[in-house]
Regions:
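Short hydrophobic alpha-helix segments
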Residues: 35-37, 90, 160
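A charged helix-plus-loop insertion that forms the helical arch/lid used to bind
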Residues: 85-96
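General beta-strand structural signal in soluble alpha/beta enzymes
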Residues: 112-116
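Glycine-rich phosphate-binding loop of actin/hexokinase-like ATP-binding domains
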Residues: 132-190
């Protein structure tokens, strides 16, 4: 056994709707080996856990063996760190409460921790990204949903049940759009993918002006942002409304938390100035005046394909080491 490498590696796992990626990561955040498989290939949780555990074992055995790996950290949507579970995910085929930490721990013989993907992103940004050295910041992930995390006093805030920081499900419009969570008027219903597309359709309905959006068979935030670059007035108006609503929601959030920065991640952030300029204006118009001008808007500078894995590796270092053997 090489004593220089004992327990100086962890496994980071990123579970998304499309793919499950896993990697061996060292203490400096270097990804040493990586593999993946399509998440959708395993609609039954037992088969999924088998595929993931088998993949992790093969990766470990091909890269130094079990004696070098301390633990496993997992990033997943709808995950609850306190429960070690994915809870009532609206998008995965696995329904109810899935005790993923326990299922994998029993198969791998390693300590396993699972956390919400936004919480994991915050850990990664603090350790390796643009939040390094900060004690108080917010992470916002914009994509198919709106994920968020409060990082304050040097750590992720979980709340009593592990659901703290869910700004996506705060109300920005009384009796507004129905959200996937079942409530009405949630910020997510206006700023995530489906909400942006709905706003685009509303803009087109309200005006008879010509727009290339009318000729697009399948609208997406990326297509709309591309049309913004071409000067399409309705596309620009779509992101103006989206940004304005986002900025209002963030102003409420920041007025309570008093963060040093808000860090943005996710595919929708590629809209750039078309989203962020109206968001920043609305934020400045509504945030508590004592912190106006002090909260930085930052975009994550970590590699998008590695961000969640790196955050999951930080989570893995935090979990107590597990062994199948009882020490005397």
């Amino acid at each position: 056994m090489n004593e220089g490498t004992v327990k100086k590696r962890v496994v980071g796992v990123d579970i998304s709707l499309d793919a499950t990626s896993y990697a061996i990561v060292d203490v400096r955040g270097n990804i040493l080996a990586k593999d993946s498989f399509p998440t959708e290939d395993y609609p039954e949780i037992g088969a999924y856990v088998s595929a993931l555990s088998d993949g992790i074992v093969k990766l470990i055995e091909a890269n130094g063996g079990y004696e070098t790996v301390r633990s496993v950290g997992i990033s997943a949507p709808s995950a609850n760190y306190k429960l070690g579970s994915i809870v009532n995910s609206p998008n995965f085929p696995w329904k109810g409460v899935i005790p993923l930490s326990a299922l994998l721990r029993d198969r791998l013989g390693l300590a396993v921790a699972v956390a919400n993907n936004s919480h994991v992103v915050a850990l990664g940004e603090h350790a390796f990204g643009c939040a390094h050295g900060m004690r108080d910041f917010i992470v916002i992930t914009l994509g198919s949903g709106l994920g968020s995390c409060i990082f304050t006093d040097g750590g992720v805030k979980l709340g009593s049940d592990g659901y703290a920081g869910e700004i996506g499900h705060t109300c920005v419009h009384h009796d507004g759009r129905l959200c996937g969570c079942g409530n009405k008027g949630c910020l997510e219903a206006y700023t995530a993918t489906k909400g942006i597309i709905r706003t685009a359709r509303e803009v087109m309905t309200e005006s008879g002006e010509p727009s290339k959006m009318r000729r697009v068979e399948k609208l997406t935030p990326r297509v709309i942002s591309q049309l913004c670059e071409e000067g399409d007035a309705m596309a620009i108006e779509t992101f103006r409304r989206t940004g304005e609503t986002l900025g209002l929601g963030l102003a409420n959030y920041a007025s309570v938390i008093n963060p040093e920065a808000i860090i943005f991640t996710g595919g929708i952030i590629r809209a750039g100035k078309w989203l962020m300029e109206p968001a920043k204006k609305a934020f400045d118009d509504h945030v508590f005046h004592n912190i106006k001008g002090k909260v930085k808007f930052l975009t994550s500078d970590l590699d998008e394909s590695e961000r969640n894995i790196l955050g999951a590796s930080v989570l893995a270092w935090e979990v107590k080491e597990y062994s199948l053997f009882i020490e005397s």
